[in-house]
Amino acid sequence: MNSGKGLQHETLTKKIIGCAIEVHKRLGPGFLESIYENAFIIEWQKQNLQVERQREVVIKYDSVEVERHRLDIIVNDTIVVELKAAKNIEDVHFAIVKSYLKALGKEHGLIINFCKKVIEVKRVIHK
C-alpha cells in the first residue's frame, strides 16, 4: 500500500465507505437497492466523486461479444461498487464483482449491503 496508486485507492475507498455509512445511518435497513443507489449518488456528489451508474459491461469469449451486463456503480472510473439489500453477502456476489473487474480491467471493488442493522462492506480485489 506504499505506492501512490494504492494510497489513492485506499483514500477513495474510505470516501465511498463513509458515504455508505451516512446513507445507512439516515435511511436504515429495509429499502430497495434503487433507493440506496439514489441516496448514494447524492452523497457522492457532495464529495465531488465522479459516479457512473449502470455501466454496461461487455462479456467476450474468444474476442466475440457473448452478452452485456450492467454493473451498479463505478466511482472515478476506478472502483466498482455493487449495492445489495440482501440478508447476506453470498459467494455469488463476490464472483459477479470479480467478473466485472476482469471484464473492465479494474482491480478494486466493493460490495455494500444495506439490509443489516450495521452496514456490511466487503472488498473485492482482482489482479
Describe the predicted segments one by one.
Residues 1-48, 119, 125-127:
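Solvent-exposed, charged helical/coil patches
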Residues 28, 51, 73-87, 100:
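Conserved catalytic cores of phosphodiester-cleaving nucleases, focusing on short active-site segments
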Residues 47-63:
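A short acidic/basic microdomain associated with nuclease active sites
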Residues 55-57, 73, 121:
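A structural signal for short, well-ordered beta-strand segments
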Residues 61-65, 120-122:
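Short, solvent-exposed polar/charged micro-motifs at secondary-structure junctions
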Residues 68-70:
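N-terminal, polar/charged subdomain of small-to-medium soluble alpha/beta proteins
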Residues 84-127:
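Nucleic-acid nuclease catalytic cores
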